[in-house]
């Protein structure tokens, strides 16, 4: 069924148009956004992902070299291994968006993190499952050219849902050659990829295709994924560039459901809540971008996009309150949506810096239905409504060097959102609101190797439940950051102290979908990042975040006071570390990496703290001419860990698994 859907989508979707995504620091250059790929298997070397050094904020750039050397299974896995960001899977299929945790923000389905791909926002407003639903699964690792991870809300180019920060992804737009790869692994995993393209100086393109099938390590957890990403770029003149493309994501999955904490402790992972649980997702996006260099100092860029999607989920929800309490039962959720958007920005190059000013607008429509079901047969209606949102924003960002060794960034944005919802057979309810978010930062170079920086900014996001009650207020934060960046010839490091004061804090149980909002919280801590490359044959990287995250004032629907308690699902520390080894003058490489999650309080269990755990992954490879062979083991020591825990229920993490990959380049 999925294979037929993928073929149909590729045939009926016309030659659709795609956009270029502005980077955090947009420089004016006639071909500054046209990144050319030549697929060559040269002598393997190690290159660490650098931290952006010139910005008064914490930004990590994941480069093409790093991407090509990282054995990531999916886009979220790529971020987890390269950017010091912790990711937790929901464990119920690839249509379930994972939870990204950054600086103590770990909301359900990554709704505190803004994700942009080629100028298109991925977060979904007016989503009945989770407001700002952010599905990393729609990204193809093999199609990614570059990725920037921006911690905190300090950049004016990102508005709604950027409480924890933003991730800006640019896909490959043109390249030379063709490559194909096939991966086989434990539990019946097969992952086939194709990447090819052309580059004729003033025009080019790239096509990426992926088919993935996995039998699942738990009963009733098999899935299929089909993806495609096509881009076409043409220089209409020396100063005008057109970028066109389309992306398609199709997936079907079965869900094993959650198990109790006692079953998890006993290793009883084979329990299946309901063999009819599962779902599907279909998503497409089209975009067109025009880039005009009006003069050597003025760049204009505009992007128009459209998105379409349908998502259906059958999932047995455990009884509220814990095992054995209440009846629980299966529910069906269905979300059918479409959206349109436009962004436009001007960048002026000055003698001492640059200024960017722009506007953006989008329209999103969602038909959301939720039913109580028995083995997929509908018993009664919980929710049936149509919702729409019109939003607009204006932003300006100036990055100036008023004197030598000093960078000042000042900016701000204003966002206005109008949301309306109409239950079937009911009356329309609507509300409009706006918010201004100032941004200010500075960086000073004390010496060639040392920089100090600080910033203060405001961020916001919409609250879960807006699709039913548009009058709900924004979740807002004031964020503060101060740090240092250190640079050497073969190493770089950064240390950042951060604090975020959040108003209208929300606690959301991802299993029961019960939310509590209206309180306050504070997140504060330190980020540490170190990357050492003593030789082309050896690379060492590590990134850690230590967080003290507590509710300052919050009362749940049950009347429990959470003031002073740790914020749910927020670890005291998270960290990553990796060693990359390549013997000199060989085509062999070895990578040993670990992800560490410190103690944390699960959802709806204040005062309870789960123990820390660490996952270790080992990967190696060798090249023979145009052939690259790669093999590895994930969760090398078979660590037992929970991907998600809420109350008495657990989604267990995957045990040890192996894989092997064959890649060939033409």
Show where each model-derived region lies.
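Conserved C-terminal beta-signal and adjacent last beta-strands/turns
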Residues: 8, 247, 396-398, 454, ...
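Short acidic/polar hinge/loop motifs at secondary-structure boundaries
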Residues: 120-151, 169-170, 230, 471
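Short strand-turn segments of transmembrane beta-barrel domains in outer membranes
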Residues: 154-156, 165-198, 209, 214-218, ...
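Transmembrane beta-barrel wall of Gram-negative outer-membrane proteins
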Residues: 186-213, 218-256, 278-299, 350, ...
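Gram-negative outer-membrane beta-barrel transporters
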Residues: 403-408, 417, 499, 517-604, ...
């Amino acid at each position: 069924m999925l294979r037929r859907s993928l073929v149909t989508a590729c045939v009926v979707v016309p030659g659709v148009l795609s956009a270029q995504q502005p980077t955090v620091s947009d420089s004016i250059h006639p071909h500054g956004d046209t990144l050319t790929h030549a697929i060559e298997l040269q002598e393997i070397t190690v290159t660490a992902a650098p931290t952006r050094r010139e910005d008064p904020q914490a930004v990590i750039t994941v480069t093409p070299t790093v991407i090509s050397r990282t054995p990531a299974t999916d886009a979220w896995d790529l971020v987890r291994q390269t950017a010091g960001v912790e990711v937790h899977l929901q464990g119920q299929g690839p249509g379930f968006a994972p939870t990204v945790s950054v600086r103590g923000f770990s909301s359900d389905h990554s709704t505190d993190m803004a994700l942009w791909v080629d100028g298109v926002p991925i977060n979904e407003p007016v989503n009945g499952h989770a407001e700002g639903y952010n599905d990393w699964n729609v990204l193809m690792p093999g199609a990614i050219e570059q990725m920037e991870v921006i911690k905190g809300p300090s950049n004016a180019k990102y508005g709604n849902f950027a409480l924890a920060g933003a991730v800006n992804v640019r896909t490959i737009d043109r390249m030379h050659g063709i490559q194909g790869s096939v991966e086989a692994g434990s539990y019946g995993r097969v992952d086939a990829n194709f990447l090819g393209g052309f580059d004729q100086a003033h025009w080019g393109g790239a096509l990426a295709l992926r088919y993935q099938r996995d039998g699942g390590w738990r009963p009733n957890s098999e899935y299929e994924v089909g993806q495609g990403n096509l881009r076409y770029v043409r220089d209409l003149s020396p100063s005008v560039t057109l970028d066109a493309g389309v992306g398609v994501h199709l997936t079907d999955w079965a869900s094993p459901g959650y198990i109790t904490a006692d079953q998890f402790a006993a290793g009883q992972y084979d329990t299946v809540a309901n063999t009819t649980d599962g779902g599907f997702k279909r998503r497409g996006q089209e975009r067109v971008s025009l880039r005009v260099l009006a003069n050597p100092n003025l760049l204009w860029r505009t992007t128009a996009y459209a998105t379409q999607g349908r998502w259906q989920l059958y999932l047995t929800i455990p009884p509220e309150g814990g095992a054995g309490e209440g009846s629980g039962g299966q529910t069906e959720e269905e979300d059918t949506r479409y959206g349109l958007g436009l962004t436009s920005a001007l960048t002026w190059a000055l003698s001492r810096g640059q200024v960017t000013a722009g506007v953006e607008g989008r329209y999103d429509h969602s038909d959301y239905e939720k039913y109580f079901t028995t083995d997929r047969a509908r018993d009664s209606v919980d929710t049936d409504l149509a919702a729409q949102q019109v939003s607009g924003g204006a932003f300006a960002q100036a990055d100036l060097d008023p004197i030598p060794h000093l960078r000042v960034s000042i900016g701000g944005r204003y966002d206005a959102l109008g949301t309306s919802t109409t239950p079937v057979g009911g009356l329309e309810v609507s509300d409009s609101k706006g918010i201004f978010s100032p941004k200010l930062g500075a960086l000073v170079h004390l010496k060639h190797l040392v920089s100090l920086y600080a910033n203060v900014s405001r961020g916001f996001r919409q609250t879960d439940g807006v699709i039913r009650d548009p009058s709900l207020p924004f979740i807002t934060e004031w964020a503060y950051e101060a740090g240092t960046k250190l640079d050497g010839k073969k190493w770089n490091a950064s240390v950042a102290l951060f604090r975020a004061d959040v108003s209208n804090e929300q606690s959301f149980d991802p299993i029961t979908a019960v939310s509590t909002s209206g309180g306050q919280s504070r997140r504060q801590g330190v980020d540490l990042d170190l990357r050492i490359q003593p030789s082309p044959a050896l690379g060492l990287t590590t990134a850690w975040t230590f967080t003290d995250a507590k509710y300052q004032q919050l009362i749940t629907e049950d009347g429990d006071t959470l003031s002073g308690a740790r914020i749910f699902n927020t670890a005291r520390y998270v960290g990553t570390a990796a060693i990359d080894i390549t013997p000199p003058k060989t085509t062999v490489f070895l990578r040993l990496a670990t992800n560490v999650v410190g103690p944390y309080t699960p959802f709806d269990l204040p005062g309870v703290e789960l123990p820390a755990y660490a996952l270790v992954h080992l990967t190696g490879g060798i090249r023979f001419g145009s052939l690259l062979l790669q093999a590895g083991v994930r969760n090398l020591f078979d660590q037992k860990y929970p991907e998600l825990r809420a109350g008495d229920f657990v989604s267990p993490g995957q045990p040890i698994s192996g894989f092997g990959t064959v890649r060939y380049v033409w």
